[in-house]
Amino acid sequence: MDTPKLTVVALTTREARIWDAGIDPHSRSVVVEAPGHRRNVHVRAAQEEQLHHRRIDDPAFYDKVIGGLPLTGDILLIGHGRGKANAMLSFVQHAERTRPDVAARVVGAIDNDLTSMTEGQILASARLWLSHHSLMR
């Protein structure tokens, strides 16, 4: 029996990393940056970015993420944040309102501190979730 295709989306308020070609340790992600977000190298610019937070529920950003997803297959979300800062929850709510077909494909969500994780660790977390989820079926 073939396993369904799983797309992993690691989502923060600033970017989404999408793995749609598998979750093996050497898979590469596609990065979707939030509109208006730029990486600053000057210390003052970096301070400005930290002090002035952007909207969590940015529809233009979420539409870009949805546009970067494959048309079929299951979706596993990985994110962090609590309450109003939870981009993963805001993304699902946006998808439910605008693209219920995409929202229906979300099969799971993992709450991890993405700021301290490498891409390999994110994929390892997805593999662990998949192995546990497969055992539950």
What would you call each of these model-derived segments?
Residues 1-137:
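Terminal alpha-helical anchor/extension segments at protein ends
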